[in-house]
A protein has these predicted regions:
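Key DNA-contact positions within bacterial/archaeal DNA-binding proteins
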Residues: 44
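Alpha-helical DNA-contacting segments of helix-turn-helix folds
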Residues: 58-64
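Basic, helix-initiating cap at the start of DNA-binding domains
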Residues: 1-25, 29-41, 51-58
């Protein structure tokens, strides 16, 4: 299935929101529920894009490594 612009935008918003949360509160203190709540989406909606919190973190790190 082809990724839509909305899906790409949602994935990007999840990464940005998670990065801000991780920077402010620390990785261990942040939950998937908090990230989803900040975005106004359900955990189920977030899990459609990323497997878990570690998957989100790994995508953030990969982006940073790309420059």
């Amino acid at each position: 299935m082809e990724e839509t612009k909305v899906t790409r935008d949602t994935k990007e918003e999840i990464l940005i929101t998670a990065l801000h949360r991780f920077a402010r509160d620390g990785y261990e203190a942040v939950s998937v529920s908090q990230i989803a709540g900040d975005l106004g989406i359900t955990k189920g909606a977030l899990y459609r894009h990323y497997k878990n919190k570690r998957d989100i973190f790994d995508h953030i790190v990969a982006r940073m490594e790309q420059g």
